[in-house]
A protein has these predicted regions:
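Glycine-rich, basic loop-to-helix element that forms the pyrophosphate-binding segment
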Residues: 63-80, 97
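Short, acidic, metal-binding catalytic loop of nucleotide-sugar glycosyltransferases
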Residues: 21-30
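Conserved donor NDP-sugar-binding/catalytic core segment of glycosyltransferases
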Residues: 97-133
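A conserved acidic beta->alpha catalytic loop
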Residues: 29, 37-46, 92
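A short, conserved alpha-helix in the catalytic core of glycosyltransferases
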Residues: 161-162, 166-178, 185-204, 209-210
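Short aromatic/hydrophobic "clamp" motif used to bind/position activated sugar donors
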Residues: 85
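Cell-envelope/extracellular polymer assembly enzymes that use nucleotide-activated donors
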Residues: 2-4, 32, 193
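Short, flexible, basic/aromatic active-site loop/helix in glycosyltransferases
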Residues: 132-160
Length: 253
C-alpha cells in the first residue's frame, strides 16, 4: 500500500523541522510527505527546500486568509497519489514505528485514531534547541507493533477521541465525503465535522491506543473567536445523518 503523510503547518518552521526529522527515523518511510501549509511566510518554504534531498516532499500552500485548516488539508489530499492517508500536525513528533503501525492497523472502512502526549514548555524548548535528540524523546516508550484484534474497533460512538493531529484512513473513504468542510474558518470543530460525516457514510472508528502516539510540542492557544459559529455548523452535521458531503470542498465530485 502506498502511504502519504500529510503534515499541517503554519509559521512554525522550528517545530516543522523537528517533525520532519522524526520522519527520517521511521522504520517505514512514507511514499509521500505532503506539507499542508496554511499560509506561512517564506521561512517555512526555505525550510522545506532544505529537506527536498532527504524526503519525498510535496508542498501544498494556501494564502494566509485566517485559519483554514480544512482547505489546506484538502489541497494536500488532492495532491496525494497514495492509498492510505496519515494526518499529523506540524508540531507532533512521531516515534520510529509510527508509520509502520498505522499501516498495520489500517483497514478500508475505518478511521484510525491515534493518541498524543503533551510536552511541557520546557520540554519543547529543549527539543527545539536540540538539547534533547528526537530519538531520545521516545527512548523509553514501549509500542505494540501488531493489530491486536477486534478490541480496537470502537464502532461509531467514540468520535470525540478522534483528532486530526494523529489519524489515518484510506483515500477512498476520504474522497467519498469530499474531505474536510472548507466552510469552517478559524479554530475548532472542522475535524469533528469530518469524523461525523465519515460515520454517516458508514466508516467506523479504530483505536490506535498503545500503538500510535505522538509527542505534541507545546504552543500557545489559538484564537477561539469563531468557535461559536463553527459550533452551530457542527450541530447541523451531528444531527443530520444524511449530511455526508462537505458543504464546501475542492474535493467535491
Amino acid at each position: 500500500v502506498k502511504v502519504a503523510l500529510l503534515i499541517t503547518t503554519y509559521n512554525r518552521p522550528d517545530a516543522l523541522g523537528a517533525v520532519l526529522e522524526s520522519v527520517t527515523l521511521q522504520t517505514r518511510t512514507p511514499d509521500e510527505v505532503i506539507v499542508c501549509d496554511d499560509g506561512s511566510t517564506a521561512t517555512t518554504r526555505s525550510l522545506i527546500a532544505s529537506w527536498l534531498d532527504r524526503l519525498p516532499i510535496c508542498y501544498a500552500w494556501v494564502s494566509d486568509r485566517q485559519f483554514r485548516a480544512s482547505m489546506t488539508r484538502n489541497l494536500g489530499i488532492l495532491k496525494s497519489q497514495s492509498d492510505l492517508l496519515i494526518f499529523v500536525d506540524g508540531d507532533c513528533l512521531m516515534p520510529p514505528t509510527f508509520i509502520e503501525t498505522h499501516v498495520k492497523l489500517a483497514q478500508p472502512g475505518y478511521v484510525l485514531s491515534g493518541g498524543r502526549f503533551l510536552c511541557t514548555r520546557d520540554e519543547t524548548l529543549s527539543i527545539l534547541k536540540k538539547d534533547v535528540s528526537i530519538s531520545s524523546v521516545f527512548g523509553n516508550w514501549k509500542f505494540m507493533r501488531w493489530p491486536l484484534g477486534l478490541f480496537r474497533n470502537l464502532g461509531s460512538t467514540r468520535w470525540k477521541s478522534v483528532r486530526t493531529c494523529n489519524l489515518s484512513l484510506h483515500r477512498e473513504d476520504t474522497v467519498r465525503i469530499a474531505g474536510f468542510d472548507e466552510s469552517y474558518v478559524g479554530w475548532g470543530l472542522e475535524d469533528s465535522d469530518f469524523v461525523i460525516r465519515l460515520i454517516h457514510s458508514g466508516v467506523q472508528i479504530r483505536s490506535g491506543r498503545l500503538g500510535v502516539c505522538v509527542a505534541h510540542l507545546h504552543h500557545d492557544e489559538s484564537s477561539r473567536d469563531r468557535l461559536s459559529i463553527n459550533h452551530e455548523r457542527f450541530q447541523e452535521t451531528l444531527t443530520n445523518r444524511d449530511h455526508i458531503l462537505a458543504n464546501s470542498s475542492i474535493l467535491h465530485p
